[in-house]
Amino acid sequence: MSDRQAALDMALKQIEKQFGKGSIMKLGEKTDTRISTVPSGSLALDTALGIGGYPRGRIIEVYGPESSGKTTVALHAIAEVQQQGGQAAFIDAEHALDPVYAQKLGVNIEELLLSQPDTGEQALEIAEALVRSGAVDIVVVDSVAALVPKAEIEGDMGDSHVGLQARLMSQALRKLSGAINKSKTIAIFINQIREKVGVMFGNPETTPGGRALKFYSSVRLEVRRAEQLKQGNDVMGNKTKIKVVKNKVAPPFRTAEVDIMYGEGISKEGEIIDLGTELDIVQKSGSWYSYEEERLGQGRENAKQFLKENKDIMLMIQEQIREHYGLDNNGVVQQQAEETQEELEFEE
């Protein structure tokens, strides 16, 4: 063994002794380099994310205009985590969570941890404590814009507090990012949109809370309403576009189109018809939709209603879509799961 190697081994032993086992290692020695995921609650979004869902141990920012469906997207993620037996927490800085609506989306409100903090510092300290416990699978902060620094709350209405919120977010994310990765917690930060004054060229829109969240986020989702969904004269919901603006774990800039129905959340039937038609699993002739020999209905809304009433056919179409994109029932990319299984068998 060379002197250089002996010196390196001694340094590694010293680092492990001081900071604990696993604090430094060769990348090839890492037990699992693949990213574990949790389904988003939307098949279209799972495919747009490229890895079959939200990556564990990462920060995700969901932003968009008012009433675009940001909280709905986050609540669907909570419902999916709970269905897998995980623990979820919702930090409601806006004090606007509707428990009845959350329950309709599949959230178990009896088990959901809820905090409605008074200040931004309190909200982020609660988030840090939950993440460091290692017992929470997903933490949602709604929203970054509502994280008001203590100095601003205690000050007078006309006082200027330039950069306080940005400084608060920057400090919090520096502390949180490492803990989130170690605990494999999914941290979803919901954010609003503001207009920059005096912008003549380019996009005048920006998100509050400074630049730190943009840097620390592994995934950034932009949620926007595209059009209203009507039944006669009644508005039943909105067609919503979710764009993956940033993605550190798969190719970015993919878009998912979903139907967000009032009182129901993301329509699984709608996205199955859209994805099925796109992949030619569902055939469209004129305004009629059909699957193999079965006619689903005339018009998209009738076809959606048919799938709602015939869950067996819906599941068959869903399985074929998952198979095409290489997703299993948990949203995990099938190829990754098979490779992991092969490695385990080889080790045995």
From Swiss-Prot:
One of its GO terms (molecular function) is ATP hydrolysis activity. It is found in: Cytoplasm, Nucleoid. SUPFAM superfamilies: P-loop containing nucleoside triphosphate hydrolases, RecA protein, C-terminal domain. The gene is recA. One of its GO terms (cellular component) is nucleoid. This is Protein RecA. The lineage of its organism: Bacteria, Bacillati, Bacillota, Bacilli, Bacillales. GO terms for biological process: DNA recombination; DNA repair; establishment of competence for transformation; SOS response. Keywords: ATP-binding, Competence, Cytoplasm, DNA damage, DNA recombination, DNA repair, DNA-binding, Nucleotide-binding, SOS response. SMART domains: AAA. Disruption phenotype: Cells lacking this gene are extremely sensitive to DNA-damaging agents mitomycin C, methyl methanesulfonate (MMS) and 4-nitroquinolone-1-oxide (4NQO). Double rarA-recA cells are much less viable than recA deletion strains and slightly more sensitive to H(2)O(2), MMS and 4NQO than single recA mutants. A recA deletion suppresses the lethality of pcrA DNA helicase depletion and increases survival of the strain in the presence of H(2)O(2) but not MMS. Induction: By competence, expression activated by ComK. By DNA damage (at protein level). It comes from Bacillus subtilis (strain 168). ATP binds at residues 64-71. There are about 4800 RecA monomers per colony forming unit (CFU) in untreated, exponentially growing cells. Treatment with 0.6 uM mitomycin C fully derepresses RecA expression to a maximum of about 26,000 monomers/CFU. Pfam families: RecA, RecA_C. Multifunctional protein involved in homologous recombination, DNA repair and competence. Can catalyze the hydrolysis of (d)ATP in the presence of single-stranded (ss)DNA; prefers dATP at least in vitro, catalyzes the dATP-dependent uptake of ssDNA by duplex DNA, and the dATP-dependent hybridization of homologous ssDNA (strand exchange). RecA-ATP cannot catalyze homologous DNA strand exchange; SsbA and DprA activate strand exchange by RecA-ATP. It interacts with LexA causing its activation and leading to its autocatalytic cleavage. Recruited to repair centers (RCs), foci that are the site of double-stranded DNA break(s), after RecN. Concomitant with the appearance of RecO at the RCs, RecA forms threads that extend from RCs toward the opposite cell half, possibly searching for sequence homology along the sister chromosome. The threads disappear after about 2 hours. Thread formation is absolutely dependent on RecJ or AadAB. Thread formation is also dependent on RarA. Monomer; forms higher-order oligomers. Interacts with RecU. Interacts with DprA (smf). Interacts with RecD2.
